[in-house]
Amino acid sequence: MADGEDIQPLVCDNGTGMVKAGFAGDDAPRAVFPSIVGRPRHSGVMVGMGQKDAYVGDEAQSKRGILTLKYPIEHGIVSNWDDMEKIWHHTFYNELRVAPEEHPVLLTEAPLNPKANREKMTQIMFETFNTPAMYVAIQAVLSLYASGRTTGIVLDSGDGVSHTVPIYEGYALPHAILRLDLAGRDLTDSLMKILTERGYSFTTSAEREIVRDVKEKLAYIALDYEQELETSKTSSSVEKSYELPDGQVITIGAERFRCPEVLFQPSMIGMEAAGIHETTYNSIMKCDVDIRKDLYGNIVLSGGTTMFPGIADRMSKEITALAPSSMKIKVVAPPERKYSVWIGGSILASLSTFQQMWIAKAEYDESGPSIVHRKCF
């Protein structure tokens, strides 16, 4: 490991919606593409096109009309290993253009990822891609590192799942981790529904992408939802217009804050679950009473679904209402939080002290996939 200074480790953060990949030491991922694999619906429709049996990422997205699309990662956890292998292959060879047998690879995993899954990831890296070394790190822990902390509670909310993960001195506390199956994709679906009620038609998966863009560009979180609703009825101050790809212009008003309000009130889309504020509070309450103060003072937001303007103030307000009155609450929303898992991985993999933490190929050959539980925790 220590012989070549030029051997940059690779960092690959596999999300439900997007893969973020790049080189350790960089400040942002080089490649960000959708976690999708598409296969042709009919063989031979594209005669002379040199048709492939599978397309990955952006190419699958652009050819979606003739493909059946699959998302190999569901709710943050890999559910289809053949397709996952295709995504990693695409990441190394087409996006980063590297030979994986020449670089250590740091992969990320969802909190509470089943043991068999970590073993499978390890096995694929060493046996299919022949990596010299690899490591698996928990996503939320990397986000906390990226914010310069080792203790705190991370609310990580992406496209497929949200988690609250209390971390003390660098270690996640598994008994207090809570999962909420409410994330970006649900908000996009909810906005599609709201816009359909208003007479706009968004049904296909291609149109879902348009709605996702509307959500990302225009949605925000109200500090006081009821008051914002009242304001929107009498004033046009919240109205914004959005031009669709075909030139049609739609106007959206209260939908801008109604859509992400679901994060705080999941009952709005018929979900019986606590909102993100209450889930965070419940997670803190599952921790030892002595560390709660440190958690309340270091609530770190991470993931694309925490990018809504107004989210930090609202979180702070809601948690202050739940916590003991003397407690100091601090919600941290780093501007780069969309990629903070990847950034944390980049930081970790480039630390000199981390170099002895890698699982080397020799160790894997000796112990098999279960080595991952001894070396990555």
Curated annotation (Swiss-Prot):
Catalytic reactions of this protein: ATP + H2O = ADP + phosphate + H(+)
Highest taxon in the source lineage: Eukaryota
Q: Which Gene3D superfamilies match?
A: 3.30.420.40, Actin, Chain A, domain 4
Checking InterPro entries in the record gives: Actin, Actin/actin-like_CS, Actin_CS, ATPase_NBD
Q: Which family does it belong to?
A: Belongs to the actin family.
More about this protein = There are at least 13 actin genes in potato.
In Swiss-Prot or TrEMBL terms, this protein is called Actin-97
